[in-house]
Amino acid sequence: MNAIELSNVNYSSDQFNLKNISFKVPQGFVTGFIGRNGAGKTTIIRLIMDLYQPQTGVIRVLEEDMALNPIELKNRIGFVYPENYFNERWTTKQLEKMIAPFYRKWDHQVFEFYLEKFDLPINKSIKTFSTGMKMKLSLAVAFSHHAELYIFDEPTSGLDPLARNELLEIIQQELIDENKTIFMSTHIISDLEKIADYIIHLSDGEVILNGSKEQLLQRYQVVSGAIEDLDDELASLLIYEEHKRTGFIGLTEHAQVFKEILGHKVNITTPSIENLMVYL
C-alpha cells in the first residue's frame, strides 16, 4: 500500500515547471525527499496538500484522490512547514481553541502531553518563542490528531545542530516506533542518513532518483585513483567525474570493472546520500 502516489503530474508557473512527476511513497516507512533549493520540493508538497492544482496528472493520498476529498484527507495528515503559520499573538492555549474544531480526531490530552514534553508554555504568546520552540509547537499540533501520514517540509531549517538532532530524535521516537508514514523534504542530507528508508531526488522539476536507500547505496559506488590510470573506456563508465590534484573521483554503477582493470590502484567506497545528491 502507498501513502502517496503521483502519476504524470505536470505543473507550470511563470518561473518553474514540474515535468511528468511520478513516484510512490510506501506506507509505514520514512521517505526522504531531497533536492537543492529551488528544485521544486515545496511546490510538490503544496500540490499534494491541494494548495496548488496540477495542470495534468493524478495525486492520490491514502488511496484517495486528493482533489475529490481534500478536507477528509487533511484530517488524516500531520503537516509541518518551515515557516510558522500560526497567529503569533495567540498563546498555545488559544491556538488549540482555534484549530481543534478543524480536526475530527483532535486529542486534547495528547496536545497537553507534547506541550509538557517539549517544555512549551501555555500562556505565553507564540511570538516570544524561539525558532526551535515554534517548530516543536508545529510538531505538537501534527502529533495531536492521530494522523496516519506526516508531511514535513524542511522541518530542521533554521535550527542549530543541537536543536536539529533533538528534533530528529523526537521524530524517531514518536513516529517511527509507531510505524507511521513520514514524507520528509530537506536539503540537509545528514538528517536523512539517520532515519530514511526510501529516497526521492528531485532536480530542476524532474525525479532523477527514486528507490530504497539500501538499494540506491548498493547500486552506486564512488571510485577514485590516479588520473593517468583513467583511460577513455573507464571514463565512459562514470556518471560523474571530477579531477583533483590528488587524482580523479567519480560515481559509477560499474565498480567491479574498475576493480578488475585497476586492482589495488582504485579506491572503491559506498556513497552517502549527499554524494548521490551532488554527483547525480
Language model: regions and residue ranges:
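ABC transporter nucleotide-binding domain
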Residues: 168-252
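Helix-to-loop junction immediately C-terminal to a conserved catalytic motif
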Residues: 49
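Walker A (P-loop) phosphate-binding loop of ABC-type ATPase nucleotide-binding domains
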Residues: 35-40
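Conserved ABC transporter NBD signature motif
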Residues: 57-68, 72-73
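C-terminal coupling/interaction segments
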Residues: 238-280
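ABC-family P-loop ATPase nucleotide-binding domains
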Residues: 79-138
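Conserved beta-strand
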Residues: 6-9, 16-26, 33, 57
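Catalytic Walker B motif of ABC-type/P-loop ATPase nucleotide-binding domains
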Residues: 150-154
